[in-house]
Amino acid sequence: MFLPTTKEEMDEWGWEELDIIIVTGDAYIDHYLFGASVVGRYLVEHGYRVGIIAQPDWKNLDDIKRLGKPNYFFAVTAGNLDSMLAHYTPQKRLRDFDSMSNEGIRKRPDRATIVYTNLIKRAFKGVPIALGGIEASLRRFSHYDYWDNKVRKSVLIDSKADILMYGMGEKSILAITKALESGENIKDLEINGTVVRVNERKIGDIKERYETKELPSHEEVVNSKEKYAEMHRKLMTMDKVIYQKVGNQYLVQFPPIYLTEKEMDEIYEMPFERRAHPSYSYVPGIVPVQFSVVTHRGCFGGCSFCSILHHQGKVIQNRSERSILKEIRKLLNHEDFKGVIQDIGAPTANMYRMGCKKGLADRCPKNCLYPEPCENLIINHKPLIKLYRKIRDIVGDDVRVYVRSGVRYDLIMYDEEYGEDYIKELSKYHVSGRLKVAPEHISKKVCKAIQKPDGRLFKKFLEKYREIAEKVGGIKEVLPYWLIAHPNCSIKEMIELAEFIHKNNCYSRQVQVFTPTPMTLSTTMYHTGINPITNEKVYVPYTYREKKIQKAICLYREEENWEKALEGFKMVGYKGVIYRWIMEQMEKKKKQKKDKNKKNRLN
């Protein structure tokens, strides 16, 4: 049974009023990979009445009023993606498709968190509003906004909401609900996993009672790129209460909340429908994930461009094997199931049961994997291999079980005891088409900025994976994902990547142009020209022209990219192997055209 989205559906639940109303920028998909569904179900499991308003019309008040006024508060999320990222390409062109909307038709506003909050304030004066989701989470402090090309204030201040939940949000939203139920004022709450606004007097009180860390003020980070870089450095650990001055008020972030294994199991075993609400004809976003299974949360990879660090965190939070296998059995009986489990994974598929042996991940500013794996890091694929085998025993030979989440190839290479066994399992039983990995780049200079191993380790992985996969009769093709126009990547580094691709036979059309998103290390480098970890200056490819050239060089095998790639080669005086390959292909095309014209004349 879906959570209610109309008064009629409230009647089906036997509810005359609601305690919490969730407003989301996504279509309502009742699946644990969609935040509104997870927190909604979690609150219902704890005895509260919850409704969902998905993608309300923001041009009038009728839609936002359809469920009435909640007893406690509205919870607002832009959806599974930052609304600006969902709407615009890296070249800031408007996208014409939104996979999280019915029929792919765009139905959310730009800066959805702010727009929805203002809509609620117009409709219901004085009702408390809590923000959540990835957009709010990563915009909780002052942040560089790529689309405005400026440093913006926290979305909590810009929206004038009452409280912001960062991270995954289940326990913090439950704590907020219980506090309001007991009569507390939302403006007085001090709950882990949240950010609040306070005045000068209150910040003094907080500093007396907590161990705190102060960020440079909003005014400082707007006017100084060095201060902005300092702010990022200070945000690399989250164990203390963190505060930032903004004008005459302060933002205060309380430490993150992590889930126990029991709590993880409770959340993922809730009775999700695993489909879009029946009011929709077709929501594309559910298709590739409908029968995916999450094994854990968090990622200690520390990629510079990734938002997971500041959202889910570095601490791996595992589900029990029992809970995962229980879900597998349940999937087999779902009426929509057609014999394929699309993914067994998480932000990084092969981090299940791994992590810091000292439990210090959230307090340690160091990268767990780069430049070398930390001595305190547990790297062991045995629990995952065991899990895969148990899943196959349950589903039998007629059901395909894939691993489509990202796999960290460096973790496999660092696991001397079970790395090769993991390759055997993966290639033989769990790869669909080609193994998807994300080296991102191979240049030492670029990989240092990205905080990933360079091409030397990836080359060794390619050789090892292909060799083992061939021996066991597995799928030996590898599909790399490449990232272009990242800070420290110039045309010379793109040529270096293209030559590596050519030499190692790992061409891929999976190429992404770097887009600066709030709160990431890469975005700090893009905005400041400084690597805040090393304090070194970095090269930043700002212009659309250079980004197009870099993309053309990476996709050098496509005929439509040859002229643009040659333009880039001319800029740096390059006449190496990729230049010669393109010239040979152009000559062949020219000869083919000439022969064809000659044949036509003879006819």
UniProtKB/Swiss-Prot annotation:
The keyword 4Fe-4S applies. It comes from the Archaea. GO terms for molecular function: 4 iron, 4 sulfur cluster binding; catalytic activity; iron ion binding. Residues 285-557 form the Radical SAM core domain. [4Fe-4S] cluster binds at C299, C303, C306. Keywords: 4Fe-4S, Iron, Iron-sulfur, Metal-binding, S-adenosyl-L-methionine. Binds 1 [4Fe-4S] cluster. The cluster is coordinated with 3 cysteines and an exchangeable S-adenosyl-L-methionine. Its cofactor is [4Fe-4S] cluster. InterPro entries: Elp3/MiaA/NifB-like_rSAM, Methylthiotransferase_CS, rSAM, rSAM_horseshoe, UPF0313, UPF0313_C, UPF0313_N. Coiled coil: none annotated. SUPFAM superfamilies: Radical SAM enzymes. The keyword Ribonucleoprotein does not apply. Gene3D superfamilies: tm_1862 like domain. Belongs to the UPF0313 family. This is UPF0313 protein MJ1155. It comes from Methanocaldococcus jannaschii (strain ATCC 43067 / DSM 2661 / JAL-1 / JCM 10045 / NBRC 100440).
